[in-house]
Amino acid sequence: MNVALVAHDSKKTLMENLCIAYRHILLKHSIFATGTTGRVIEDSTGLTVEKYLEGRLGGEQQLAIQIAHNDIDVVIFLCDPEFEYVGEPGIAGILRLCDTHNVPLASNLATAEALLLALDRGDLNWREILR
């Protein structure tokens, strides 16, 4: 499955720790991430990550396009609720696309862990049928 990982700057360490803890699950899937987040994940876990541009430079738009084309199966977007990009898709745009295309999305650690465990159990295999 294709898993997208995005984290605002204040959440990058949290994303790094999540990926270290669940490396054994992520290893079985294709990982996509915005530029800086992807580099952090690669450096700390050794996982192969297909990196978009940095979020502010268009990486979130690249992710949005892949969601719209139903090429992403799970999104984990650890966002800083106090941070807002004006004129960028950000979490609101990504959430809207995920809702439109039935892509599971986690925006906090608790939901991210639940999605990763569901992914490992095969609970999200129905996504394969959609592609």
Give residue spans per PLM region.
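Structural/interface elements that position substrates and couple domains in central-metabolism enzymes
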Residues: 17, 21, 38, 48-51
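Short internal beta-strands
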Residues: 28-37
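Short hydrophobic/aromatic-enriched beta-strand-loop microsegments
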Residues: 30, 47-58, 126-129
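Mid-chain, well-packed structural core segment of small domains
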Residues: 60-100
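Short, acidic/small-residue loops that bind anionic groups at enzyme active sites
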Residues: 95-115
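Short, glycine-/small-residue-rich phosphate/pyrophosphate-handling segment
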Residues: 110-131
